Structures are given as structure tokens and as C-alpha cells.
Amino acid sequence: MTSRREFVLASAAVLGANDRIRAAVIGSGGRGQLLTGEFKELGTEIAAVCDVYEPNLNAGLKIASTGAKAYNDYRRVLEDKALDAVIIATPDHWHARMAIDAVEAGKDVYLEKPMAHTIAEGADIVKAVRRTGRVVQVGTQRRSFDVWIEGKQIVDAGKLGNIRLVSSIWLNRQGDFPERKLEGKLDWQQWLGPAAKRDLDAFRFFNWYYFFDYSGGLLVGQAAHVVDAIQWFMNSKYPLAVTCSGGKPNLKGVEVTDTASILMEYPENYFATFTLGYKAMRYHTFNDQLTQFHGERVRLDMGRESYALYPETSAMELKPVAEKKQPGAFWKTATTAHVRNFLECIRSRKDPNAPVEGGQATNIVLTMALDSLRSGKRIQYNPETGRVRS
């Protein structure tokens, strides 16, 4: 694997000292700040930071390149013709509008997952990206992590035999929200954007992840990674039907549950499940995030940072025939590799590891899951019309 230093030096050699990729970060909360650091370490000039909340903006500027410009309106960012790319790490309900505006302004985009908030939004993103020819990487970094790339190769090689069932779990434990107050200027109307208008609500602002107007919560946020990986491994573009059920939220004052299961039915004649439990014991093992591909000959267990192959003859499943473990690698290595792939594709103009078509395939499932969760019905998808029905 190319080291960070080797990548930066190679990029400089190809582009020249005055041809560094110049990017802006739109949305400078926790994830936006992490990505700012990743891009900067890989030789990108972070020339601008945009956020509607003053403390986030200031925090992002401290990490960005020297002389970075500050904005609170993303449209002004896109007017800068010297920018090559933008990094979108805003709440989910803004993803589609910002991504489409960015590619139409001639920018390449690193777009955090989930790609969109509705099926129609995702379809519009795909059309805009293909119409403009821009490079867009969706932030599902498992596609760039060598452990998961090797797992995909194992499935593609047919080692598991026919796969009729894929099961997955994501376990964690989350405490109550800390009490927080606004500590600087916030452009509330700009933050709401395409969402329903309402009076300023600091609790909603800080905990937007758990309200349906802005996101699908942990259910969508974590399933985005797992569902994307399942469909990537299985070469699936859409489900036939999705059913989701969940309990009441364990956290006070929010809408989206943190304990739920999704059942996905596919035209390739297999079923997949995803179960989220955020009031569970946090397993400090490779199995707190586990996706199992149940082949007729071999089972493949994909952990967050590991994989293991178990044939029928594995005594008590204690001795896999093949395995790989990289403890602690995912949190840093996967994102770094994903950002590196995006930067390489800006130069080569090739499709990145997580193209928008894959992002939309996942977005379809996630949107259907939320529809099912809220309606209590099995949701069916029509690939000809791109519409759903119960």
C-alpha cells in the first residue's frame, strides 16, 4: 500500500508545485473536521471552510490550510473558480442540493453518506454527475479498505458457493445526550434549508441525526456502510422489497429509534438482514460489527477490521480456513485510503471506489427502510419507475 508520504510526493511530481488540488469543506462539524485533516495530510490545500454555526467554522479554519477563506453560505464557495473539489459533510437533508449544485459548478465532490435523503434526490444526483462528468466519491470507506476489498474478491471468486442469506449486526452502547447551548452565531434558516420551517431549536440543531426531517439516525447512518458492502459484494443494484421494524427510541426527545432490524429481499434470489442495537454491551472484539455471507460451501464473516472463512468441517468454528485481522486499523486506514482514491480519481478522471450508482443503490434501501419503519408495512420497489409502494 502506498504510504502517505509517497502519495504526497508522487502527486507533487505529477502536478507540479503550483498544481495542488484545492478543496473546500462544507459542513465543519466533527466529521468535516476529521476529513479536513485527512485531505490536508494527503497534500490537498484546504482553501475554504463553510459552516452556518460559528464555532464549527472557527474550528475548521484552525485545521485548514493557512489563509483559508471562511463562508457561511455554500453557494458563495461554489463561485470560486480556483477550487477543484468540495467535501460535503453536512446534515443529510442538505446532501443532494449541495452535491448537484457543486457538480454543476464544475467541482468534484467527496460526499458523506448517506448520499441523499430520498430516492428521488439520489436519482437526481446520479443524473447530474453523469451529465457533468464530475468525480463524486460517496463516503462509504469500506470499499477502499483492503480487508473488505479482499473479502469482495473471495466472494467474486465463488469460494462460498451459492449465497442465499446475508446477516449483519451492529452493536454499541450510547449514553444520554449532554446538555448543550449555542456558543456562537447560527444561521438557523440557512441550516434548515429544504427541511420544514420551524422556530430555532438548539436541541434539534445539536441532535439533528435523530430527527426524520434531517436524517435517518443511527439506523441509516450505520446501515449505509453495511448495506452498501452487502450490495457491493453481491453485485446488487436494488431490492425487491424492504421491511423494517424497531422499538421506541431509548434516548429522550428524539424520533429515530436506535434498536431496529431491516429485512431486504433481492431479485438475485437472496435475503439480507441488518440489525442495529445501540443499547447493547459494546463488544471490544472483531464482532461488534459483523456481516456474515452464508454460502452453501463456506461462510464468510466480515468484521469491521477482519474476515474469516469457515467451511462445513470447521470444528466448533474455532479454526477458520483463512482469516485476516487488522486491529484498530479501520478508524484511520479506511478513511485515508478512501480519500486517497478520490484524489487519484480527480487526476485520472476515472470512477472512484464508491461511485454514485452504488450510493443510490444503498439510498434506495435506506429510504424504503425508513418508510417501512414509520408505516409498519412491507415496501416494494419498482426499478422501471424508480417508485415504491406498500
Language-model region placement:
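N-terminal secretory signal peptides and thylakoid transit peptides that target proteins
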Residues: 1-11
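NAD(P)-binding Rossmann-fold cofactor-contacting core
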Residues: 44-62
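Short, conserved SAM-binding/catalytic segment
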Residues: 60-66, 128-129
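Conserved SAM-binding strand-loop segment of SAM-dependent methyltransferases
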Residues: 68-73
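N-terminal Rossmann-like NAD(P) cofactor-binding module of classical short-chain dehydrogenase/reductase
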Residues: 86-87
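Beta-strand-loop-alpha-helix segment that lines the small-molecule cofactor/substrate pocket
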Residues: 91-92, 96-144, 158, 376
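Contiguous beta-strand/loop segments that form the cofactor/metal-binding neighborhood of enzyme cores
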Residues: 150, 162, 167-168, 175-209, ...
